[in-house]
A protein has these predicted regions:
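Bacterial N-terminal signal peptides that target proteins for export
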Residues: 1-9
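Flexible loop/hinge segments at secondary-structure junctions
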Residues: 20-355
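Bacterial Sec-type N-terminal signal peptides, specifically the leucine/valine-rich hydrophobic h-region
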Residues: 14-17
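Low-complexity, intrinsically disordered short peptide segments enriched in small/polar/basic residues
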Residues: 9-11, 32
Length: 355
């Protein structure tokens, strides 16, 4: 299956949803021909694989899966109830409190949160590049827009090579291709990579305690001078860019590393390489959970929605050795998977997020 919406079309789609998708009464819905899931580019290959299997076993229409980024998918999901809005939002982070409130405002009051597994964010290069070992404050000093200067004040980041950041790193130009602001992968990168790297600097660790807002601004604001390059929602495009631009670096989900390990290689963070085992255990520091959000008000209206969700969470799909592990999904521990399967069967409605 292909990515069914181009990035340029997503704004038009959302405007259309705002105009005609906010039929908030489940009783007034008309059934759509098939299931519609939209959101994270990282969850996209997992959702498309489940969609293919679901269509094959059910004999029905293949579910429509769109890669809009986590933020774009949740935005579309929260536009209302009815056939002009997605049944499922795919997300590489938890839904935010502000997004949950948008859903409620537009009549999407019954949302089921299901954790499907884990993913790690990898820092990768083409296979012929030298080995990097990132640690401590390396990522912050390379990619933050402002860093502490010699006198302790914050200055525009002057570092142009990795060896200027850390003499133990290669003397290659800092040029990192990564996810845009609409992506859940970007949110995860800022929280799991940039913020801890900033806290490795004593002055910033102190600032995190005394002025959290200022700390977050400094830790989460990436360079705009070409050292960091927003590369759209297609992680495969980043992989292709790395093969065409030797010396550059990319940030994307572990599943894309698994699919392209003949073209690119990952590098360690704090001495730990990303693997299924280190991501599942949390030993690899840039690890995260992935989710699907189901619009319960569409259950019983969109044909096959419950069946699709249960296929997604089945042992054969999301379990250890399941077909999604072949795509790079890091499975949940057995007990956690059983709990998520129970939530999916019961369609347990989530409570409001706190953040």
């Amino acid at each position: 299956m292909t990515r069914t919406l181009l990035a340029a079309a997503s704004t038009v789609a959302l405007l259309a949803l705002g105009a005609c998708g906010n039929d908030q009464s489940a009783g007034n819905q008309t059934a759509r021909a098939g299931i519609w899931a939209a959101g994270s580019s990282t969850v996209f290959p997992f959702a498309t694989r489940v969609a293919e299997n679901d269509a094959r076993t059910s004999g029905g229409a293949a579910p429509r899966v769109e890669s809009l980024g986590t933020g774009g998918g949740i935005q579309a999901f929260c536009q209302g109830v009815g056939p002009n809005t997605p049944d499922i939002a795919n997300a590489s982070r938890r839904m935010k409190a502000s997004e949950f409130e948008l859903c409620r405002t537009n009549g999407v009051t019954d949302i089921v949160e299901i954790k499907i597994g884990f993913d790690g964010l990898v820092i990768a290069t083409d296979r012929n590049a030298p080995d990097y070992g990132f640690s401590g404050d390396d990522l912050y000093l390379a990619l933050a827009k402002e860093i502490p200067g010699p006198d302790g004040t914050f200055i525009a980041n002057p570092n142009t090579t990795w060896s200027q950041v850390n003499p133990g790193l290669p003397a290659t130009r800092i040029q990192v291709y990564g996810p845009p602001p609409t992506s859940g992968t970007r949110d995860s990168w800022l929280e799991l990579a940039m913020a801890p790297s900033a806290e490795a600097i004593p002055a910033l660790a102190a600032l995190a305690e005394s002025d959290e807002d200022r700390f977050e601004t400094l830790a989460h604001t990436l360079r705009e001078d070409g050292a960091w390059v927003d590369s759209g929602e297609n992680d495969n495009a980043i992989v292709q860019t790395l093969t065409r631009t030797p010396g550059s670096t990319g940030v994307f989900g572990y599943s894309f590393l698994e699919q392209n390990n003949n073209l690119v290689k990952a590098h360690s963070v704090n001495g730990v390489m990303p693997t299924l085992e280190t991501i599942a255990s949390g030993e690899y520091p840039i690890s995260r959970s992935m989710f699907i959000y189901v619009k319960k008000q569409h259950v019983g209206v969109t044909p096959g929605l419950e069946q699709f969700v249960m296929e997604f969470m089945s042992d054969a799909s999301a379990g250890r050795g399941g077909y999604l592990q072949d795509r790079g999904l890091v499975p949940l521990p057995a007990a956690d998977l059983a709990a998520q399967q129970a939530a999916a069967r019961a369609m347990t409605v989530m409570t409001a997020p706190t953040e």
